[in-house]
Amino acid sequence: MDTTKQVVVDLETLSTHANACIVSIGAVLVEDMEITDTFYINVDGRTCKEAGLHIDPDTIKWWGEQSKEAQQAWQQNPVPLQEAIDKFTIWYGRESIPIWGYGANFDVVILESAYRALDMFIPWKFWDISCLRTLMNVLDKRLPKSNNHNALDDATAQANMLIEILKS
């Protein structure tokens, strides 16, 4: 695997469905085994709902049980879904590079669902999608415990784990 350039993405959502409403996107660019850039944006959940994305009452309840800091983090300066996806696409670029999520059926799948809901071009190829959780399970690795639920903090922790694994 060419490890020179990778993107790790983490989302905070209002559902666990594949077409979940996204409330924040955090991403980290890893180049030559170092974090070289980050991306973070909060998304207006109403615009996700308007785009047909799913909101789950159980997930809303779960968020209500999280810390005030976690709840407030994704409510600060949210932008419409279209703007968030546009900005993420500009940040990611048009060149398909490996993109990692923490779960084979979560972050990248949900992000792709948002692209499709907006009828937008997905900038990565399906073969560039990888699952960090699967890799960690095979290698018996664990992320540091965190209840932060901040997309950028989580993406950074995951990127650091990816770097550790790729260096070993």
Question: Where on the chain are the PLM-derived regions?
Answer:
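Short, flexible loop segments at boundaries between secondary-structure elements
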Residues: 123-142
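Acidic active-site catalytic centers that drive phospho-/nucleotidyl reactions
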Residues: 10-12, 107, 131, 154
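Conserved non-catalytic scaffold segment of RNase H-like nuclease domains
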Residues: 2-7, 12-101
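Short, polar/flexible loop-turn hinges at active-site or ligand-entry regions and domain interfaces
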Residues: 70-74, 118-124, 145
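Short, function-defining helix-loop hinge/capping sites that tune catalysis or transport
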Residues: 18-20, 115, 162
